[in-house]
A protein has these predicted regions:
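N-terminal Rossmann NAD(P)H-binding glycine-rich loop of SDR-like oxidoreductase domains
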Residues: 3-27, 31-32
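NAD(P)H-binding glycine-rich loop region in Rossmannoid oxidoreductase-like domains
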Residues: 5, 36-102, 106-109, 124
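Glycine-/Pro-rich loop/turn segments that contact NAD(P) or position catalytic residues
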Residues: 83-169
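Substrate-binding strand-loop-helix patch
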Residues: 180-189, 208-226, 239-243, 278
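Amphipathic terminal alpha-helices
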Residues: 265-294
Length: 294
């Protein structure tokens, strides 16, 4: 039986990856800081993992002394671990790079055959952002390590799009640019299946999107219609957002990074190769009740 260690198993993709490996007959060990989180489903329908996976190990990737033996007997390591947003006293560099580097250092002490890592789509076009640089610093460390690897680059997840439905609930969506650029996000469960597929031998870097392509304007309209609201969308010219970014950058690095990301995704085509069978409209309709105000 093949054995996998899933790092970041309390997160959105980590949960789906752990479940997908288990369904394919793998022995699944998960590493988490707080095992209590695995006793309940995630906020976007992600599966609970207690009683599903074979072994739950408690450890903190930022503390190497808690990681001893985590990869003992493991064939493949999967990591989607990373900060969703920067926090006081903790940076993207600390977790997305150093945390994963600590995992890799421990992994190299064992006979692990493969390391699968979830990075960022079109990262080379957004390297000025802290979160992107941290991801790609680890990608380079992984490539330099000599271990077989797969680098997965999803463009976005369905759960990311719920922010637009929440905005729609307030009555208006405000967005940089003109809404003409395109994106095809993927459901976390479809992404989990791809994670298992890429455990096959051989170096791989894969761009990943979902089956349905939308312009941002079409995505916003769908966010409104699935909660029975009339679309109201305000687009802000990019030159205004860029000016705001230049003003904010020396004052607040976190907000500046958020603005930089908003600018970046409105200057590149975010469509990726199509995978999966689940659809954005169905996901919006499932969560629409939670975002509806009558």
């Amino acid at each position: 039986m093949q054995k996998v260690l899933v790092v970041g198993a309390s997160g959105h993709i980590g949960r789906y990856a752990a479940l997908a490996f288990k369904k394919r007959g793998w022995f699944v060990r998960v590493l988490v800081r707080d095992p209590e989180k695995l006793k309940r489903p995630g906020p976007f329908g992600e599966p609970l993992l207690e009683g599903v996976v074979d072994e739950i190990v408690t450890g903190d990737a930022a503390k190497p002394d808690t990681l001893f033996g985590i990869a003992d007997g493991i064939d493949t390591v999967f990591s989607s671990m990373g900060l969703r947003s920067s926090k006081p006293g903790m940076s993207y560099h600390d977790i997305d790079y150093l945390g994963n580097a600590n995992i890799l250092q421990e992994v190299m002490l064992h006979d692990v055959q493969k390391f699968i890592y979830v990075s960022i789509f079109k990262a080379d076009e957004m390297m000025e952002m802290q979160i992107v640089k941290a991801h790609e610093d680890f990608v380079q460390a992984l490539k330099d390590s000599g271990i077989d690897y797969s680098i997965l680059r999803p463009n976005a997840y369905f759960s990311d799009m719920l922010q637009f439905q929440k905005m729609a609930t307030s009555g208006v969506i405000i967005w940089p640019g003109d809404g003409s650029l395109r994106i095809n996000p993927i459901h976390g469960e479809d992404m989990g299946d791809i994670c298992v597929d890429t455990a096959a031998p051989g170096h791989q870097e894969i761009d990943i999107g979902g089956p349905d392509i939308f312009t941002y304007k079409e995505m916003f309209t769908l966010a409104f219609t699935t909660i029975d609201k009339e679309p109201r969308i305000i687009f802000i010219p990019l030159w205004i957002v860029k000016g705001l970014h230049s003003f904010i950058k020396p004052l607040n690095a976190r907000i500046a990074d958020m603005l930089a990301f908003a600018i970046a995704v409105n200057e590149i085509d975010n469509t990726a190769p199509r995978y999966g069978e689940r659809h954005m409209k169905d996901f919006f309709e499932t969560f629409g009740g939670k975002n509806r105000t009558d």
